Amino acid sequence: MTHTKLLVWSCVSLALCVRAFAAAPTDIVIDDQKVFPESLGSTPDGTLYIGGSSTGRIYRAEPGQTRAETWISKESGDFHLVLGVLADPATNTLWVCDNDLDAKTATLKTFALKSGNKRKFYLFPGGGLCNDITLKAHAAYITDTINGRILKLAPGSGELSVWYNDPSDPSLDGIVWAKDGKLYTNTYDSNHLIRINVNPDGSAGKATVLSTDLPLYQPDALRLSTDGRILMIEGQGRPGAGLKEGRLDEVVIHGDSATIKVLKSGFELPAAVTPVGNIAWVLEAKFDYQRNDDLKGKDPGTFHAYAVPVP
């Protein structure tokens, strides 16, 4: 290749790289009002799926888009209070937690990931609050925040069963299987990070509340980065914190303790995180506009998911 051709090719390659980099959004706005989104999922190509807790809708932003638009309507999904959202490209499934608080009914719902068409719905035995979802070996594990339970949907099963139960420490929220083969969850109200061992038969074993080098406050979503590190959201980071002191953490486990590495703070009450490559998308929920008497009735503004590079 001549020097001239090499120079031309280098310039073309650089231009393409710059264009691709410029096209990658760092901020996605949900194209709706008063959404109060609680969870989001992703696929490796960068598509994001976001659940609107108050609107009862699933929003989708395809790769390169800067706005997430309604994809599954409230009517199509028969939604009420939408919480956990998890995308599973391997089975072309979108998992969604839906709750009817008046009827005390919680439902795990599945949809076709590509089309959004309904698949199967699974009621929580005895009611509860379907909060978040994780997968292992084609089984789904779901936190029940009200009752302190983790429910399991085994492959091929038509109903949910109780896999873990500790009513003394409810408010289970985030949930994830880590590379060590153990399940990790947390409690939003008691600020606990919990490791659950697994017995040889697959049942839940000993649960351990891990000590942390930094105090937790409003721990929420748990997800693995693409290289297998544990990512966690904290709504405010500390009691009495301002509106924009939520944070994204990396959790490093050492025996019965954990080191909390703050990757980025300054989010307005975030509730969820999902990885795409070396990016962690952090979703702001702004729940203070529903909970804080000084903010109720005021305009929360737009709702965003932000791209955070994970070093």
What do the PLM-derived regions correspond to, one by one?
Residues A24-I30, R67-S76, N117-L123, E159-D166, ...:
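A short beta-strand motif characteristic of beta-propeller blades
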Residues D31-L48, S76-D98, F124-Y141, D166-L183, ...:
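Beta-rich, blade/repeat-based domains predominating
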Residues S53, N99-L101, T145-N147, P155, ...:
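Short loop/turn segments immediately following the C-termini of beta-strands
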Residues G56-Y59, A103-L108, G148-L151, N191-I194, ...:
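Structural signal for beta-propeller blades
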Residues E62-T66, A112-N117, A154-G158, N197-G202, ...:
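Short loop/turn segments that connect beta-strands within beta-propeller blades
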Residues K104-A137, T143:
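Asp-box/WD-like beta-propeller blade repeats and closely related beta-sheet repeat scaffolds
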Residues L108-K114, G246-I253, G297-P311:
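Beta-propeller blade signature
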Residues T274-P311:
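Blade-level signature of beta-propeller repeat domains, shared across WD40, Kelch, NHL, RCC1
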